[in-house]
Amino acid sequence: MARKKDTPQKAALREMMGNYLKENNVTVKDGTDVNSIMRDMMSIILEGALDQEMDEELGYSKYDYRNKETDNSRNGHSQKTMHTSYGDMEIDIPRDRKGEFEPQIVKKYQNTVTQDMEEKIISMYAKGMTTTDIESHMRELYDIEISDSTISRITDKILPIVKEWQERPLEEIYAVVFMDAIHYHVRNEGRIVKRAVYIAIGIDMEGHKDVLGMYVGQNESAKFWLSILNGLKNRGVEDILIACVDGLTGFPQAIEAVFPDTEIQQCIIHQIRNTTKFVSYKELKPLMADLKRVYAAPTEEIARAELDGFDEKWSGKYPKIAKSWKDNWANLSTYFKYPEAVRRLIYTTNTIEGFNRQLRKVTKSKTVFPSDESLLKMLYLAMVDITKKWTGHRQDWGQIHSQLEIFFEERLSGL
């Protein structure tokens, strides 16, 4: 098949490139050679375009002084390193004496790679790749040298998006909100410190699941949760029917201070873990079987009777277990008042713990984050990737919604 005839522009370019390769004794053996030539071509094209922009800015071309109608003039060039898909290159940026020239093809503070490469880097960062891995990947696949600082600058573009996401308006009413914290190590002022990432996941009245917010703070505290709850209210949340939380001291009081009508369900799985961690291996299985008779009981009355029986049998060796269950019973037993479908939804924080496990898969390559911001960037990007699969609503949502309408008739009357 005959080659398609070149356009005049392509023919001129083909001739120019042929002369360039021949006169400079350039041979093209691999992709590295191609990238080198492309960098030279791109720099020439960009510099020519920048000179044209300067001509338009001043109103006269470089040596056409007779048509000069401005007191401004050219003032040499400054050099800038551009990170492109073909590697780093130096280009000359024209300057004017008054400093008024604002180039558009290469903006004043633009020196990063192309948009396509930025998206590749952000995608790799979102999947948990370290900066060293990203550097190696870009070097091997694209023959591009990219520094830690460049990767950081590119991923920093996420931070304003994260801020906007954290402040976005929310639904007026959520059927259930799950709240939990996940912990990471961060470098701070030369020391490695522990950070808690506070996470809230809501299920709205249509059954759709959404991450309402992620916040980096000190070790988990009810005081910080109080500020988060106030933030949710300021973003438009007027009511939460049921809040599912761990056993953090003061958490129920923090919720009640902001959403006084919210039912609180303390996570049963957290309670089991916290109260059985010091039980001997030999006795763990029979003790757990007796404890299951409490939380798996069909009614609260039966559960309370089973707890009393558990207390009599085990408190000689493990007095703190039954005491903890009794002390927290008001919030542990909330789910007993609801039918089975709602119980399955709220009696554990599996919804948020599953999300946390997916976050850990992404962040497992980072034992220590260089800053709070770098931690938040990676978690946000991971969250975006994870929640792409959160389409539709729960399979049994129709049943759950009908039951919630009965139990919360007054609070849902305005919907």
Regions inferred by a protein language model and the residue ranges of each:
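DNA-recognition alpha helix
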Residues: 132-143
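Acidic/histidine-rich catalytic cores and adjacent linkers
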Residues: 3, 293-415
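Conserved beta-strand -> loop -> alpha-helix junction used to position metal-binding or nucleic-acid-contacting
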Residues: 242-249, 254-290
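Active-site phosphate-binding and catalytic loops of NTP-dependent enzymes
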Residues: 55-71, 160-172, 184-189, 389-391
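Basic, short loop/linker segments at the boundary and entry of helix-turn-helix/winged-helix-like folds
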Residues: 69-127, 143-156, 172, 222
